[in-house]
Amino acid sequence: MAVTFYSGFKDKFHALDFLTDNVFTGFQIKNKICIALKGDHELEEFSFLRNKKFFETKKIEFLCLKNLTTITDKFEGEFDEIHIFSDKISDLPGSLNDNTFVYTLKSDEAINNASRELYTNLKNKGVNVLHEVI
């Protein structure tokens, strides 16, 4: 099991844009996807980006909500992929797979602090933590 942390985004828009592209890849292989977002504002921005990408690419997958779950605080259920851009997720359930991604942002101190705590908790559990600077 491994969790990938992405960092180095210029702002929230770029982080959500990258997240949206990653989610679209999951839709192509019909994964059940969970997205943990900081709050309603980020959910609105994610929805805006999904629609924008649909109009730019004409790929219907961006409009598919059937296999997409969004949360703001805790995980319930099993997922093929988990994407986290939240300040409320500091630990993860034990039944994770290699398709867990965490997006961090220096300009959002709450998300950055929660990501650091999550990183520490995962390392203490012996989870393989990967880091990629974007």
Task: Give the residues covered by each predicted segment.
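Structural motif
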Residues: 8, 36-40, 84-88, 105-107
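Short, well-structured hydrophobic secondary-structure segments
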Residues: 16-63
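Active-site acidic carboxylates
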Residues: 45-46, 74-75, 115-116, 120
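A generic structural motif
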Residues: 56-73, 129-134
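Mid-chain, well-packed structural core segment of small domains
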Residues: 63-102
